Curated annotation (Swiss-Prot):
Gene, per the UniProt record: rsgA2
Protein name (Swiss-Prot/TrEMBL): Small ribosomal subunit biogenesis GTPase RsgA 2
A Pfam family that the UniProt record links to this protein: RsgA_N
Residues holding GTP: N126, K127, V128, D129, G180, H181, S182, G183, V184, G185, K186, S187, T188
Cofactor: Zn(2+)
GO cellular component: cytoplasm
Signal peptide range in chain numbering: none
GO biological process, one term: ribosomal small subunit biogenesis
Upper lineage: Bacteria, Pseudomonadati, Bacteroidota, Bacteroidia, Bacteroidales
Major localization listed first in the record, in broad terms: cytoplasm
Domain of life: Bacteria
Length: 310
């Protein structure tokens, strides 16, 4: 029997079978040992084969080949990865310029990982109703930056419903992963898109100005127009997994494009003479914040923070 994984609690998986049943499944112990160094070898969005037992329980015994997935280093700094979701048509990264602030380094790490696994990303700038004039100017500068690179952007207020209809329309016929820091209003936005869903929402810690986790597992929801949303727990950081140093620049489209003009083919864009990328940064043709994010990821590689895939 085949089906789609629509929920993952860490201990069991809910599968919607091709004939419309909803079945809770486990994975067999030996399935975990098939060379998959991941905290969750089965992810929401996976197409799977399941076997029903006489006792009424079910096991996942096979995962179909994935079209793509979004992966990050496991938060416990082990040699394992964590797969956020699989078989995606797009991601929507929900970000805020304050309450809490989403750093450009976090945004760029997420974008680079999505580029590596060929998942299109759109940026959703939430809480536009809460910002002062300086924050709104900064917001517009970020939108100008990322739109120019090629990432579509939305301005929304999930709380007031502003801009939500444009996102709804963009979800039609697609499987979309929603991700972002805790506290950016991701769950509030999903509730605005799907009023009957009642995804749990949380408050902001006033001491740290950071969000508190409300979603504790990944889950898929149906949306109008034959689409699906995958809601994931809020993430604090985005440790990139299985990237070689020389590949990192490939996942920054504007850096990769300019790097063709570097004097040396193996230029790291840090100190080499004749570096077209550094020249473009100095001329403000490449954003300094994006270049900083690129260097930050190179530093991770040097410090051994990247993990090899197994």
């Amino acid at each position: 029997m085949k089906g789609l994984v629509i929920k993952n609690t860490g201990s069991w998986y809910q599968v919607k079978t091709d004939d419309g049943q909803f079945i809770e499944c486990k994975i067999k112990g030996n399935f975990r040992l098939k060379g998959i160094r991941s905290t969750n070898p089965v992810a929401v969005g996976d197409r799977v084969q399941i076997i029903l037992n006489q006792e009424g329980t079910a096991f996942i015994n096979e995962i179909e080949d994935r079209k793509n997935y979004i992966i990050r280093r496991s938060s416990n700094l082990s040699k394992q990865s964590h797969i956020l979701a699989a078989n995606l048509d797009q991601c929507m990264l929900v970000v805020t310029v304050n309450y809490p602030e989403t750093s450009t380094i976090f945004i760029d790490r997420f974008l680079a990982s999505a580029e590596a696994y060929r998942v299109p990303v759109k940026l959703v700038f939430n809480k536009v109703d809460a910002y002062n004039e300086d924050e709104l100017r900064y917001l517009d500068a970020l939108i100008n930056l990322y739109t120019h690179i090629g990432y579509p952007c939305f301005k929304v207020s999930a709380k007031e419903g502003t801009g939500v209809d444009a996102i709804k329309k963009d979800l039609e016929g697609k499987i979309t992963l929603f991700s972002g820091h805790s506290g950016v209003g991701k769950s509030t936005l999903i509730n605005a898109i799907l009023p009957g869903t009642k995804v749990k929402t949380g408050e902001i810690s006033t001491y740290h100005n950071k969000g508190m986790h409300t979603t504790t597992f990944s889950e898929m929801f149906s949306v109008d127009g034959d689409g699906y949303i995958i809601d994931t727990p809020g993430i604090k950081g985005f440790g990139t997994f299985d990237m070689e140093e020389e590949e990192i620049g490939h996942y920054f489209p504007e850096i990769f494009k300019v790097s063709a003009d570097c004097k040396y083919g193996n230029c790291t864009h840090r100190h080499e003479p004749g570096c077209a990328v550094r020249e473009a940064v100095e001329k403000h043709l490449i954003s300094e914040s994006r270049y900083t994010s690129y260097l930050n990821m190179l530093e991770d590689k040097e410090e051994g923070k990247y993990r090899a895939a197994y």
